[in-house]
Amino acid sequence: MNSEKIFYDILNVAAENVDLEFNDKKYNQFIQYKDLLKDWNGKVNLTAITEDEEIIKKHFIDSMKIFQFEYLRKANKIIDIGTGGGFPGIPMKIMRPDADIVLLDSLKKRINVLDDILNKIGINDVETIHGRAEEFAKNPKYREKFDAVVSRAVANLASLSEFCLPYVKVGGYFVALKGPAVDEEVKIAKKAISILGGKLEEIREVEIEDSDLKHNLVIIKKIKNTPKQYPRKPGTATKKPLI
């Protein structure tokens, strides 16, 4: 069986597992995305994962697994905070072209690369933002305007909640993709989540078939407005998390 058929089948099964349609257009966008990631990665650090099958499993399918949380299959307005190489935001957009998706990253070079990738894979309705999450969360255009915020960023959950929850409208969700050992991190972050207007709803384990990768979806519901003093000045949430 050739690699093209293998990759199509892997992606198709992942889509079926989250009840989303998969087709040739989506497949071709994923393959173009993979190739462009590899081309750009020598110039701008986007990913430590460079093998084709690993990119598909550990970036694309891992991102698609976020749709195991059913709310994200229907949410209209979604922002990906600290998107890096475009994960999970671009795979989400490929799978849900109807969604209004925004990508934010603090590194201008990465945003320029993502603009190039999006253009070349035929997606022209994603907003990309270069800047600090703490600064744009104060902007009325973005503050509490999103049905969902997603992030695969490496910050601890208390800090990440301060970056992300201010963007979520009341009744919406913040979904963090975290590693396998998340219970202690969640316990430490509960104070921050509460202060910022959130409530932990669920921790959902995610496994990638035929892979050593394990993740947890930490699902936090926004139940009240974030106090206006949050997020604090850039860098504060990292240095002095609300714990």
UniProtKB/Swiss-Prot annotation:
One of its GO terms (cellular component) is cytosol. InterPro entries: rRNA_ssu_MeTfrase_G, SAM-dependent_MTases_sf. Transmembrane segments: none annotated. S-adenosyl-L-methionine binds at G82, F87, A133, E134, R152. Its EC number is 2.1.1.-. Specifically methylates the N7 position of a guanine in 16S rRNA. It is an enzyme of class 2 (transferase). Its main location: cytoplasm. This is Ribosomal RNA small subunit methyltransferase G. It comes from the Bacteria. Pfam families: GidB. It is found in: Cytoplasm. Belongs to the methyltransferase superfamily. RNA methyltransferase RsmG family. The lineage of its organism: Bacteria, Bacillati, Bacillota, Clostridia, Eubacteriales.
